[in-house]
């Protein structure tokens, strides 16, 4: 991707502001379904006219519905299952310390689909590329899609829930894994706070690093952002800091981070598509 310009930065700042308002008015249940749809729905609202027209031309369904397609084809295309994540290991500080697997991963799959969408290939291939891009940008903003292979991205790290917290979250299970917490339970809790009229305090670290977060512009950068979140003791993923019980205090502390990741996913997805379709339009000019 091209280096950021001041116009790019201002554009993304505007998108983040609008995206925040959009997210606060959205119902939120699970990143693997509802959150993917919301990320793409909000990204679509941020597209320019050229990009919106191209999305409508390529797709045979709404953009938000298109963004869950990649999960729905796992059973018929099992070779794509590894494309939804990138494995790391304890002690890793940057995705550059890992090796892309031969079977593919979220970063290499996204890069491939970006190339396809930006090409003059068949409409069907470009349609699927667009659906993959919408989904993978979301996956690469969920920290536990760039987590340890040894515990399947937090799927084998379990926490128990109190009956009170089960009721707040509308969760029947008495025991959940860390991946599920970040896939959807934190978002449910954020909606609970909003419905209760409580404000969600922004993390000071997020405020302090807002400009640097926005300037990180490649899928590898997004992965490094996730790794930084996972390496934060407050996330509770590092072995010395893991807890046996999911608490309301944890959800309250982590909700601003999870929601910020979703807003960034929408904003970056919109910027990416605006750039891709603008480049194609320019190339097609006589």
What kind of feature is each model-predicted range?
Residues 2-16:
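Bacterial N-terminal signal peptides that target proteins for export
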Residues 29-136, 143-286:
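N-terminal, motif-rich segments that launch catalysis or mediate targeting to/interaction with membranes
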Residues 17-18, 28:
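Cleavable N-terminal signal peptides
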Residues 3-4, 22, 271:
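Intrinsic disorder/low-complexity segments
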């Amino acid at each position: 991707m091209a280096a950021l310009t001041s116009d790019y930065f201002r554009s993304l700042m505007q998108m983040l502001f609008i995206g925040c308002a959009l997210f606060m008015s959205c119902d939120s249940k699970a990143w693997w379904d509802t959150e993917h749809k919301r990320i793409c729905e909000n990204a679509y609202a941020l597209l320019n006219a050229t990009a919106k027209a191209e999305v409508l031309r390529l797709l045979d369904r709404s953009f938000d519905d298109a963004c869950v397609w990649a999960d729905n084809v796992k059973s018929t295309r099992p070779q794509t299952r590894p494309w939804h994540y990138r494995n790391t290991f304890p002690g890793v500080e940057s995705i550059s310390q890992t090796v892309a697997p031969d079977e593919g991963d979220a970063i290499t799959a996204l890069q491939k689909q970006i190339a396809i969408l930006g090409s003059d290939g068949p409409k069907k291939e470009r349609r699927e590329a667009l659906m993959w891009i919408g989904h993978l940008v979301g996956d690469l903003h969920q920290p536990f899609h760039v987590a340890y292979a040894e515990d399947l991205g937090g799927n084998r790290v379990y926490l128990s829930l109190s009956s009170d917290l089960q009721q707040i979250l509308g969760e029947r299970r008495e025991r959940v894994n860390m991946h599920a917490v970040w896939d959807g339970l934190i978002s449910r809790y954020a909606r609970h706070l909003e419905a209760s009229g409580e404000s969600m305090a922004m993390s000071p670290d997020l405020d302090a690093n807002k400009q640097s977060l926005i300037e990180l512009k490649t899928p590898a950068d997004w992965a490094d952002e996730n790794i930084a979140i996972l390496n934060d003791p407050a996330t509770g993923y590092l072995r010395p800091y893991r807890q046996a019980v999911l608490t309301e205090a944890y959800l309250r502390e982590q909700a601003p981070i999870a929601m910020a990741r979703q807003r960034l996913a929408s904003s970056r997805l919109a910027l990416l598509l605006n750039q891709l379709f603008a480049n194609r339009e320019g190339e097609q000019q006589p």
